[in-house]
């Protein structure tokens, strides 16, 4: 039997910490859209590796952007 794992886990990193971002703003759609899947759901931090501080800011920014019609609430193809 092999002791080696079947796949190699890559270390997850926080994109906002790497960019030295102080605050996640709702007007910065390029950063926000990386954290939304195609049906307009917010990707959890356990998948993206985002720190909890930035995940809370990101969720708040996405909700504000949706309210201001900068981002859709649901997918258009439904």
UniProtKB/Swiss-Prot annotation:
The record's listing under Pfam families reads:
Ribosomal_S18
- Which UniProt keyword terms apply here? Ribonucleoprotein, Ribosomal protein, RNA-binding, rRNA-binding
In terms of Gene3D superfamilies, this protein maps to: Ribosomal protein S18
> Which GO molecular-function terms appear in the entry?
small ribosomal subunit rRNA binding; structural constituent of ribosome
Question: Mind listing the GO biological process terms from this record?
Answer: translation
Q: List the disulfide bonds.
A: none
Listed under GO cellular component are: cytosolic small ribosomal subunit
The record's subunit annotation is: Part of the 30S ribosomal subunit. Forms a tight heterodimer with protein bS6.
| Protein family per UniProt | Belongs to the bacterial ribosomal protein bS18 family.
Task: Name the job this protein performs.
Answer: Binds as a heterodimer with protein bS6 to the central domain of the 16S rRNA, where it helps stabilize the platform of the 30S subunit.
Q: What is this protein called?
A: Small ribosomal subunit protein bS18
> What organism is listed for this UniProt entry?
Blochmanniella floridana
This protein's encoding gene: rpsR
């Amino acid at each position: 039997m092999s002791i080696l794992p079947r796949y190699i886990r890559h270390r997850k990193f926080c994109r906002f910490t790497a960019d030295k971002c102080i605050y996640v703003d709702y007007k910065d759609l390029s950063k926000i859209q990386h954290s939304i899947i195609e049906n307009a759901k917010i990707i959890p931090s356990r998948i993206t590796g985002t720190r909890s501080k930035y995940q809370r800011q990101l969720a708040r920014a996405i909700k504000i952007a949706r309210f201001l019609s900068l981002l859709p609430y649901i997918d258009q193809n439904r």
